[in-house]
Amino acid sequence: VTFSSPESISEAIKICHSNSIKVAVGNPPMDVALSGGWGVTCGFLDELLARGIDYVEISCIARAIDDGDLEKVILAAKQRNIDVIIEVGVEFAHSQSEDGNLFIERRIQQAKLALQAGAKMILVESEGLTENRNGQAYRWDVIDRIASNFPTEQLMFEADDQDVLSRYIDVFG
């Protein structure tokens, strides 16, 4: 559901493109499409293509997605000339995970697979790392462990406040 008309959305996308600005769609609509099965997912990707969307985000933490399905969706997006941003992290929304149960190596392997399948970028989700830590120290060690596996030009970071953003700029440029 959107409160903007299809025409106003199309006009905004045209303005972005005329100024060399790429347009992305975040994970929630893709998550809904994936829940609907392969036909719905392909239909959603076709709609993104028709609207001129440049990037789509696929989350590896908002839902369970196995490696084969992840690769299949990335390839389907690439066939439509839509670049993929893969979201990785340790928590989604306000879920709680214990620091000892983060499965970091699995997150890294899934991100590597996504890049090999054709994903353009890796987005490191802040939830549980620098956001919603309930007074506990930020998990810069986990962020470094994930990020050190990828070239900086293929990394994006979610930053929920100015201090976190400044730290990312200091460390990663």
Regions found by a protein language model. Give the residues of each.
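Short, compositionally biased "basic patch" segments
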Residues: 9-19, 112-117
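Hydrophobic faces of well-ordered beta-strands that scaffold small-molecule active sites
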Residues: 21-27, 56-58, 84-88, 122-124, ...
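Hydrophobic/aromatic-rich structural module bridging two neighboring secondary-structure elements via a short loop
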Residues: 23-48, 55
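Catalytic cores of alpha/beta
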Residues: 36-44, 103-115, 161-172
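Conserved anion-binding
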Residues: 49-131
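C-terminal alpha-helical cap/extension of soluble enzyme domains
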Residues: 145-173
